[in-house]
Every structure is written in C-alpha cells, then in structure tokens.
C-alpha cells in the first residue's frame, strides 16, 4: 500500500502529453486491428496505466480499457467512495467500480461489439481469475497478448517522463544525504531517509541496506536493528507520480570521507593484476595511455 501523497500536476504531466501518448497507442491498435486494449494496474505495477492516464492506485487493482474510438475507462476494484479522488488524480472518461474487474471490463467491451478483438499487455502476467472473468464477461471476445505492441511505445521516454524521473532521482538523492553520520544507528539512518523522501513529495519509498559490506554486499529490507561494519550501503527506491527511481550510496561507519587517492590506489592495484599483453601493466593513476597525456579525474 502506498502511504505518501498521490496527486496530479498538470504542469508536470500536461493533458497534451497524455493525448500524444494515447494517439500513439491508438495508431498501433489500428495497425494491429484491435478494437480495444487492456492494461492492468495495482500499487506495485502502476507504470503502464499511469503513463496513459496519470492514475496511480494506492491499493487494490484496476483494468484500463482503451477503446479504439472512445476515451479510456478505468474499471477499478476500489470502492465507489474514492471515485472523486480517482477523477481528481487522473485523466479518464469514466470510472467503473466492481470487485470483478475482468468481468466488468469484458462486459463493457462486449456490449458495443460482442466479437471485439482485444489486446492485453502482459497477458501471461495477468491473474488467472481475471482472465477467466474476461472470458465470462465476453464469451465471444478474441483475447490476445499485446505486450509487443505496447512496449515499443514506451521504449523512448518523452520530456515529461524524463522530468518526472529527474524529480524522483532528486528526491532519492536528497533523502540519502540526510543520513545522520557518525554514531547513528542503522535504524536512525533509514528513518531519516524515509522521512525526507516523504517530505519532498514521494508517493512511496523503500529503503534497503547492506549493514556490513565486508561480510555481505546484498541489499535487503531491515527488520529491527543490525550492527554496522566499517562500511555499509543504503538504497532508496522512490516513487514519484508513477515514476520509480532507485539510488544506492555507500557510507563509512565513522562518518569520514575516504580520500579519492585511496580509491585510485585500489584501482591501480587491481589493474596491475590484469594481463599486460595490452599494456595494462603500464597503467599509472591519473594517466590516459590512449590519449598519451595526463587526464583529470572527474569528481
């Protein structure tokens, strides 16, 4: 369940952007001969529906129905009491509520064309119960997987999507910078990261940790307290208006910043162990063999 603020900003996601995306989907539908296109969403799989409508569910699940000749309709398992909230935070022609979203979506499509051709993104990943309800709600509907139709449309991000990703990254970066430092426990560091991310507008934030990098570099969710090694890592996974970003930083337990020279020395030692047939043995920190001149390291 998402616990942060879910809102819509027309400045960040204008109607014109959604119109352009929808037009691209409809053009692909026409080329594939589809009468309708379905996208599934829940609080962990919000990206596709959010990309077309701006809608991000805080809980439960829904199906977005995109007819070839009408505006998108959301069939949601959320109760009717959140109808006005859904309408405020997304751009939809209509919201239909019902516990059996597959049956409701299929019935709506079949009412206009009983033998409609329906493409479904990630059909194999759709719950069996929803697929069965789609067949019950529209026995004559022709259902097929349309993942290959939808995926290329999102392969290249538009400026609005890039801007949302940059905002999410800024939230994650700012949050990771709030770790208390010397003497702080792991729990205090995680709490500081989560608090800052939510203050900055994150819809959701998950923090994972590798408490002792010398022993185990795997990042995991921490329950309770864990002893810190000489260095540890924290990863912030942040959602902002349907866009997810994940950033990881490593930290020394004592709060000191390790000199860049130490990192360069470790790199040089590692490179010295490589085969020298291509000249690796001649590597010296701060020098570029290919350029034949001294190069400055970027900070």
Regions found by a protein language model. Give the residues of each.
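Active-site neighborhoods and metal-handling regions in enzymes and metal-associated proteins
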Residues: 1-299
């Amino acid at each position: 369940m998402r616990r942060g603020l879910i809102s819509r900003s027309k400045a960040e996601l204008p109607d014109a952007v959604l119109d352009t995306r929808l037009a691209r989907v409809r053009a692909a539908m026409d080329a594939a001969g589809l009468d309708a296109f379905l996208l599934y969403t829940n609080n962990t799989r919000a990206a596709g529906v959010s990309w077309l409508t701006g809608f991000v569910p805080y809980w439960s699940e829904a199906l977005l129905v995109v007819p070839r000749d009408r505006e998108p309709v959301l069939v949601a398992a959320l109760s009717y009491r959140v109808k006005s909230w859904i309408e405020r935070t997304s751009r939809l022609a209509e919201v239909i509520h019902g516990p059996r979203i597959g049956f409701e979506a299929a019935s709506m499509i079949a009412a206009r064309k009983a033998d409609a051709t329906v493409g479904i993104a990630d059909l194999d990943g759709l719950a069996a119960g929803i697929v069965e309800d789609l067949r019950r709600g529209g026995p004559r509907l022709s259902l097929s997987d349309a993942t290959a139709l939808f995926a290329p449309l999102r392969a290249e991000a538009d400026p609005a999507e890039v801007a949302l990703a940059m905002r999410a990254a800024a939230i994650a970066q700012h949050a990771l910078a709030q770790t208390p430092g010397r003497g702080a426990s792991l729990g205090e560091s995680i709490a500081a990261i989560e608090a800052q991310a939510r203050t900055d507008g994150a819809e959701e934030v998950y923090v994972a940790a590798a408490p002792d990098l010398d022993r185990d570099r795997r990042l995991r969710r921490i329950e309770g307290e864990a002893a810190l090694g000489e260095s540890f890592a924290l990863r912030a996974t942040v959602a902002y208006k349907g866009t997810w970003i994940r950033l990881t930083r490593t930290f020394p337990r004592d709060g000191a910043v390790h000199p860049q020279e130490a990192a360069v020395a470790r790199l040089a030692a590692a490179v010295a162990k490589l085969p020298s047939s291509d000249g690796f043995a001649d590597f010296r920190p701060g020098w570029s063999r290919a350029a034949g001149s001294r190069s400055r390291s970027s900070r």
